[in-house]
Amino acid sequence: MKVLYIQSGYGGIYSYFDRWAEECFQNTHTEYMIADKPEAESLMKIEAFQPDFTLMMVGDRVPHDWLTWLKGKDIPVYVWLTEDPFYMDISLQVIKLADAILTIEQNAALYYQELGYQNVYYVPIPVNHRLFKKMGTEHSYHSNLLIIGYPYPNRVQLMKEAVHLPFTVRVIGKEWGKYLPKKVLKQPHIDVVSTWVPPEQAVHYYNGADIVINAHRPYHFAFNQNTMRIKNASFNNRTFDIAACEAFQLTDLPAAHPFSSIISYHGMNDFKEKAAFYINHPEERQKAAAANYKETVPAFTFDELPAKLKAIHLALS
């Protein structure tokens, strides 16, 4: 199996996804080639390489140049829709030129199948379990409640409620300082880190938290491009990162196969009750976290990605 991997071209966490994808091909001795932009020299090398298929992550923009060239050369295209369902409007443009559709959202997969597309696969963004793992951390990383990520409205509301609980709360992510009231920011038990933290730091925060709050991006967020308003029912990649650390998480999506051990909350009162319960019952946190780990590692690690791609390739051959 010869894989052409087109780098996403995005910054932030996507630069890590690109690196981890390349590492997983190396670790599994998969024959691969990496390309960035469709420039003349790269295109010549691709033709000489003769890939069996192309894998490309697609988020909030359509890679027209790549899709046009690849189709013109009859190189099968596997699009990995890593922002479903939030940019479904973009995805619906891209899948018209795809030979296989890989999506991180099971509801999106069902929708594509309803439209008549056949080669549709649920493939969540896996975890780099060599980085995200259980480890001891300095006391400065400890918190009772931790949330990492962009301040979506549901997360902001959650934090406004969490500050009234008798626990230390740490919030990490760009722009949080803009969305939380000043009286919240001044609370001594609240620590707001208004910057993006790379995975190498995030792993320490996960390991240092009693509870990681994993509230998902809303499907109807104002800046989404999801005209069909497809709801997200699948866990985000942060779920697997936290689980691989054997850290305890509370999430707002209901547990479902293949992640039946995830602990969910349903509404604000349930969140506060479960936060209090699990803070005071560390043995229950450890039990749930261990179950989360077993459901995630090794099944949803980057090392397993080449085997999943090979299975798809064989099914389409």
Swiss-Prot record:
Domain of life per record: Bacteria
Annotated Pfam families: DUF3880, Glyco_trans_1_2
Signal sequence bounds: none
Residues in coiled coil: none
Induction annotation: Expression is GerE-dependent.
Effect of disrupting the coding gene: Spores produced by the deletion mutant are more hydrophobic than wild-type spores and lack the polysaccharides layer. Mutant spores do not have a crust.
InterPro entries, per database record: DUF3880, YkvP/CgeB_Glyco_trans-like
Family matches, as SUPFAM superfamilies: UDP-Glycosyltransferase/glycogen phosphorylase
Function: May be involved in maturation of the outermost layer of the spore. May act as a glycosyltransferase that contributes to the glycosylation state of the spore.
Name used for this protein in its record: Spore protein CgeB
Native organism taxonomy: Bacteria, Bacillati, Bacillota, Bacilli, Bacillales
